[in-house]
Regions:
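Cytosolic regulatory regions of ion transport systems
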Residues: 309, 316-323, 327, 337, ...
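Transmembrane helical cores of multi-pass secondary ion antiporters/exchangers
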Residues: 1-388, 401
Length: 528
């Protein structure tokens, strides 16, 4: 089983590279690979446990939604937050009811089943949208990238609420009062727990120091799970809570945030592989011919009527340009969210005449395969690409090329800085003294501040990062090493190597030619 799982993940990684080369969304490749391994595929893996799939996929979707919030840079998103949140909520409702009306009036489905299909496919998929924007680096005009990211991350809770409420009505257990109570509970507990967990997590992160490396990532992972599980346990909207907590934590000033974003990038990437592969595994291609025509009709109506109408009604009053409306309409990708909600409907006790799961599955395949593939070309044809924009700025792992780095230097009695004022020292251009540590005192210096022997001077400069050119390695010196006892200037190294640091008995030494190497030293060497 472990061997098979490893092979599947490796195949997904390989297909990711292949799909990127041919311009196809990677998530489509994961689904198709799942179908290849499934009951009707080449490898005939028997899997039809919808309940198990729903539980796994719901948690996975919670992680994706949390990451959608955590990775969104609010300073960029807040410029378009008002209209985008209206688009996420009202847009999902309008899309659901328009699609439901089409299913009833044109395809002849039952009213409640029609509305259920509309609700299930009413939200855009954060994983699909993020994947296309990042992989294709779509730098879009008028803040459109931020609109798409914020909408796709925040409209899932609305689709979930609609789906839950309609399923309740289909089972005949919903009254007008029960409908209102369910709606209020979803919103109240979702927002309430999201706010409380966010405040508690921020308080702990800022006051608790994690000594062991990686424990901050473990802590945030636990918070993400808690933000979904707690409100869900009391009838609240776990996805709404997840997104709120993700937004708050992702935009709180905490150390190592970029590393956390990259950690969750990896976790979410693995979750997407698991989720989309599992959805493909669950599908039966042999059952699709009977539903391909209604699925195609719904997909066409959704893409060319329902979604554009909802976007136009909401965005035009905010002064959106027609080409921006066209692009936002086309970028309404359906993905894992819709299929997970379809699984939720399938395992529910509500009676349905149609194969909702496979109908939604086909719609998602068409959406990712056609819309996702053509989105970069569509953006270019609409002249929505702006080379002066950078889509990566809308994500929290973006950092400017001129990121500031800090270094500290201890001033020895024989240093030519000792006893001199800062303004009299010829520092290189671009280097700034930002703080002086003197005994237990922290001094914010001016040009007239005098540096004394024993001071620790903190300097800032523009950072440099390029992992393709430099490799750091450690070298331990034992008593038999040929360098032991020699000065740095006396050792012979290759021309592209340099000793950048020496660890000695818990101290960090920045070497010069006069420094003599000793037994037990750990040399940090860089090579080009």
């Amino acid at each position: 089983m472990l061997i098979l799982s490893s092979v599947i993940v490796l195949c997904c990684v390989f297909f990711n590279k292949i799909s990127d080369k041919f311009g196809l969304p990677a998530l489509l490749a994961f689904i198709l690979l799942g179908m290849l391994f499934g009951s009707d595929g080449l490898f005939k893996i028997e899997f039809d446990n919808y309940k198990f799939a729903e539980e796994i996929c719901s948690v996975g979707l919670g992680f994706i939604i949390f990451y959608g919030g955590f990775g969104t840079k609010w300073s960029e998103a807040k410029k378009v937050a008002g209209k985008t949140l209206i688009l996420a909520s009202a847009g999902a409702l309008l899309t659901a009811f328009a699609t439901g009306a089409f299913c009833k009036l044109v395809l002849g489905f039952e009213w409640l089943e029609s509305l259920l299909i509309g609700a299930v496919i009413s939200s855009t998929d954060a994983a699909s949208v993020f994947s296309v924007l990042r992989s294709k680096k779509l730098n879009l005009r008028y803040g459109t990238a931020s609109i798409l990211e914020l909408e796709s991350g925040s409209n899932d809770p609305w689709a979930y609420m609609l789906t839950v409420i309609i399923l309740s009505v289909m089972k005949g257990g919903a009254t007008a009062g029960g409908f209102v109570v369910s709606l209020l509970a979803q919103v109240f507990f979702g927002v309430g727990f999201g706010a409380l967990i966010s405040l508690g997590a921020v308080y702990l992160i800022k006051r608790v120091r994690f000594d062991a490396a990686g424990f901050d990532a473990i802590f945030v992972t636990a918070i993400a799970i808690l933000s979904y599980a707690l409100p869900s346990a009391v009838g609240g909207n776990g996805y709404l809570s997840c997104y709120i907590v993700g937004i708050v934590l992702g935009n709180t000033k905490i150390s190592g945030k970029t590393a956390l974003v990259h950690f969750f990038d990896g976790i979410t990437g693995f979750t997407q592989i698991l989720l989309f592969f599992l959805l493909g595994l669950l599908a039966f291609p042999s059952q699709m011919p009977s539903i391909i025509l209604p699925a195609a009709a719904i997909a066409l109506f959704l893409t060319f009527v329902a979604r554009p109408a909802a976007v136009t009604v909401i965005m035009k009053p905010f002064g959106a340009k027609w080409k921006q409306i066209a692009l936002i309409s086309w970028a309404g990708l359906r993905g894992a969210t819709s299929i997970v909600f379809a699984i939720m409907a399938t395992v529910d006790d509500a009676y349905m005449k149609n194969d909702v799961f496979h109908i939604v599955f086909c719609i998602v395949l068409m959406s990712i395969g056609i819309q996702g593939t053509l989105l970069p070309l569509f953006a270019k044809k609409l002249d929505m690409i702006d080379d002066e924009e950078n889509v990566m700025k809308t994500f929290n792992d973006y950092s400017d090329e001129t990121e500031v780095q800090f270094i500290k230097l201890s001033v020895q009695p024989d240093s030519n800085w000792a006893g001199r004022k800062i303004k009299d020292i010829p520092f290189p251009r671009g280097l700034l003294v930002v703080m002086i540590l003197r005994d237990k005192e922290k001094i914010i210096p001016t040009g007239k501040t005098q540096i004394l022997a024993g001071d620790v001077v903190v300097l800032s400069a523009a950072g440099f990062y390029d992992d393709s050119h430099f490799v750091l390695s450690e070298m331990n010196l034992d008593k038999h090493h040929e360098w032991c006892g020699l000065k740095v200037s006396e050792i012979t190294m290759s021309e592209d190597s340099l000793i950048v640091m020496i660890k000695r008995q818990g101290r960090i030494l920045i070497p010069n030619g006069r420094l003599r190497l000793k037994e037990g030293d750990v040399l940090v060497v860089t090579s080009g």
